[in-house]
Amino acid sequence: MRPCRPPGRAAVRRRYPACVPINEWSDSIQVAELQNDPSFAEDMGSLAVYYQRCADDRKAGRADARTRDAVLDMRHVQFLNSSNIAQLLRVRKLAHLAGAHVRICSVSDRIWGILLATDLDRIFDFSEDVATALAAMQMTRGR
């Protein structure tokens, strides 16, 4: 039995999962549910562009709206390569220049080992899950 599909439409097979959007959780926090490459690179690129614009606006004195902090949900990330690590560092730097914070959460043991080996555990803030990360972000913004 063939699956139902509209006439003239072929089945679409995806090699990779669809890119997960970056969700605006509140006026001050956005949550990125990251996947493996190539989605990881696309999402990190989107965050980098956002924070670059915010940093440029801040530098030029045009910071009308408050820059959103970011929670990077890495629950679906199964590996990190050197390019991914460079993207994490770039987003962190740009967020800092824009006056925002970045928090990583839901890290698997395998990814945690990579973060420890590269000393990124000393640079980033971490939370166990998204809910804890959001609570920590709200407390940080409250100061």
Task: Provide a role label for each language-model segment.
Residues 12-55, 74-76:
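STAS-typified acidic loop motif
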Residues 69-71, 79, 83-131, 135, ...:
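Amphipathic, Lys/Arg-enriched alpha-helical "gate/interface" segment within cytosolic domains
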